[in-house]
Amino acid sequence: MTTPTTLSGAILDPMLRADPVGPRITYYDDATGERIELSAVTLANWAAKTGNLLRDELAAGPASRVAILLPAHWQTAAVLFGVWWIGAQAILDDSPADVALCTADRLAEADAVVNSAAVAGEVAVLSLDPFGRPATGLPVGVTDYATAVRVHGDQIVPEHNPGPVLAGRSVEQILRDCAASAAARGLTAADRVLSTASWAGPDELVDGLLAILAAGASLVQVANPDPAMLQRRIATEKVTRVL
């Protein structure tokens, strides 16, 4: 069996084979009462649509640096796997980028990173609305992710020669990092992990998302956590590990 070329293929394809419809990411926001559950199929479809948007509309590819100015959120996971389907590199800091995906409150940061590159890049804003409503009041030239992504296909041709994935690391290096992170915590495919951790840096992203999914486990990600709800959520979501 050949190893998938992209990080998205290496992580998503085994999940799709093992259990395409079971929950892989369950997202809560205790401030709004939001709960969203994604299966492997749904996550892969959103990732493919995002990759097609990046490739076809925002001119991104395997040499591209894509700034991810987003919180730990189910849509962020889809965006990241979309970036990696096309072989581009996800940038989590304020270094120069060719494309930036951000929330509306981080537009100034996005403008700064794409305008510090040799050629001014593209910016897309995510509303992160659970019903897919668009971001409003955007400046001219800024793409609304929710509006743009829905017209793109949910299948994608993966990049055969991807560039660095994250922090200059290759697909193989990130997979080794994932394996080490999972082994250090004893994670297995039987685990359901509850986390309130951020994905702000490469190591946090590996520990808080990628290592969990690469191990075949599932993630319950909670934003604005209410401590009073923790024990009940552990029981109802059948959580086996808490980060």
Swiss-Prot record:
Spans traversing the lipid bilayer: none
Family in the record: Belongs to the TIGR03089 family.
Gene3D superfamilies from the UniProt entry: N-terminal domain of ligase-like
Source species: Mycobacterium tuberculosis (strain ATCC 25618 / H37Rv)
The organism's place on the tree of life at top rank: Bacteria
SUPFAM superfamilies: Acetyl-CoA synthetase-like
Protein name, entry field: TIGR03089 family protein
NCBIfam families for the chain: TIGR03089 family protein
